[in-house]
UniProtKB/Swiss-Prot annotation:
It is found in: Cytoplasm; Cytoplasm, Cytoskeleton, Spindle; Chromosome, Centromere, Kinetochore; Cleavage furrow. Residues 101-104 are annotated as: G3 motif. This is Septin-6. One of its GO terms (cellular component) is synaptic vesicle. Pfam families: Septin. Residues 403-434 are annotated as: Disordered.
């Protein structure tokens, strides 16, 4: 493009200013490329599918390498997500590739909640990136972006229809990640069955409202090939790292008693189509879609939950400061309301406690009066008994004194008579003879 043809747009009323000579900002694309190459790229793939569908083998085949990883155990009660990151180099371009596998997916008897760990994992990566964005001191240029850029959903080659587990899982994931469905081990069914199976899968996805990733057609440079490849979805793939000699060439293939399936032969499977669409043509679009669509949706929902918004009820622009002040005032209002409620509750409880204490005090007074009355009655009874006892004792003493007096008088009278007799005997001796 000539320098005179370059224009800078500022708005609808901007002017086109021709340049008198070379300025140099036509090198911006080169600067961007050089900077991007020096920083490297990251790409994160989520492989979802039942055990034994060849997920690890397909990853090895896609990147033409043997990824070392810990062998997965399938004895877990639920679905476990296993993440492995690898540094790859092709020419002078570095790629930090993360492969996340769903260990144990579809192994449970009750598969109702099999999708939940996957959704939680994807949301956790979004949340980690959001927290990094919200920091005061951000280091996004060196932050390892772990957001999932594409989900390769492996469909079992049944030849009939999608399983309920597949439909439910893809429906839960389609708003969170770019889904590319693939028919795993497609050499297990015939070509005619495979063609019908593809049509059936596409029909079921549409009827159930599952939104899978569509290769973009708005870029003229790739619109034709992407439009063609959209018609081939879902891709029927075969993976193999084994090289077989076919003719004079060594090719990756799978050998069977009835023949050989060449992985990179488009007449045998769609592996080449998948590799072209996933890596060579649309890798950057997958990264952009993840950030601009899925992450933005998550970010918007989280910020709305936190009370942030772009416009007020009258659809007028609402700045971050205004949002903060509104949220702060709302929080203070809620705090004051809570304080008032707590104060009222405290006052009410104090009143209730006072009423309880007054009632208890009243009961105690009544009990005290009752006991006091009983005590007085008992005291009066005892005093009456004591009075009666004193009267009886006085009467007894009087009777005793009277008896002693009578006894004393009787003794005195008897003594007088005896003396009188003795005197008479002395004076009259004949009385003694008697």
């Amino acid at each position: 493009m000539a320098a005179a043809d370059i224009a800078r747009q500022v708005g609808e009323d901007c002017r086109t200013v021709p340049l008198a000579g070379h300025v140099g900002f036509d090198s911006l694309p080169d600067q961007l490329v050089n900077k991007s190459v020096s920083q490297g790229f990251c790409f994160n793939i989520l492989c979802v599918g039942e055990t034994g569908l060849g997920k690890s083998t397909l990853m090895d085949t896609l990147f033409n390498t043997k990824f070392e990883g810990e062998p997965a155990t399938h004895t877990q009660p639920g679905v476990q997500l296993q993440s492995n990151t690898y540094d790859l180099q092709e020419s002078n371009v570095g790629l930090k590739l993360t492969i996340v596998s769903t260990v144990g997916f579809g192994d449970q008897i009750n598969k109702e909640d099999s999708y939940k760990p996957i959704v939680e994992f994807i949301d956790a990566q979004f949340e980690a990136y959001l927290q990094e964005e919200l920091k005061i001191r951000r280091v996004l240029h060196s932050y390892h972006d772990s957001r999932i850029h594409v989900c390769l959903y492996f469909i079992a080659p049944t030849g009939h229809s999608l399983k309920s587990l597949d439909l439910v899982t893809m429906k839960k994931l389609d708003s969170k990640v770019n889904i590319i469905p693939v028919i795993a081990k497609s050499d297990a069914i015939s070509k005619s069955e495979l063609a019908k199976f593809k049509i059936k899968i596409t029909s079921e996805l549409v009827s159930n409202g599952v939104q899978i990733y569509q290769f973009p057609t708005d870029d003229e440079s790739v619109s034709e090939i992407n439009g063609t490849m959209n018609a081939h979805l879902p891709f029927a793939v075969v993976g193999s790292t084994e090289e077989v000699k076919i003719g004079n060439k060594m090719m990756r293939a799978r050998q069977y008693p009835w023949g050989t399936v060449q992985v990179e032969n488009e007449a045998h499977c769609d592996f080449v189509k998948l590799r072209e669409m996933l890596i060579r043509v649309n890798m950057e679009d997958l990264r952009e879609q993840t950030h601009a669509r899925h992450y933005e949706l998550y970010r918007r929902c989280k910020l709305e939950e936190m009370g942030f918004k772009d416009t007020d009820p009258d659809s007028k622009p609402f700045s971050l400061q205004e949002t903060y002040e509104a949220k702060r005032n709302e929080f203070l209002g809620e705090l004051q309301k809570k304080e008032e409620e707590m104060r009222q509750m405290f006052v009410q409880r104090v009143k209730e406690k006072e009423a309880e204490l007054k009632e208890a005090e009243k009961e105690l007074h009544e009990k005290f009066d009752r006991l006091k009355k009983l005590h007085q009655e008992e005291k009066k009874k005892l005093e009456d008994k004591k009075k009666c006892l004193d009267e009886e004792m006085n009467a007894f003493k009087q009777r005793k004194a009277a008896a002693e007096l009578l006894q004393s008088q009787g003794s005195q009278a008897g003594g007088s008579q005896t003396l009188k007799r003795d005197k008479e005997k002395k004076n009259n001796p004949w009385l003694c003879i008697e």
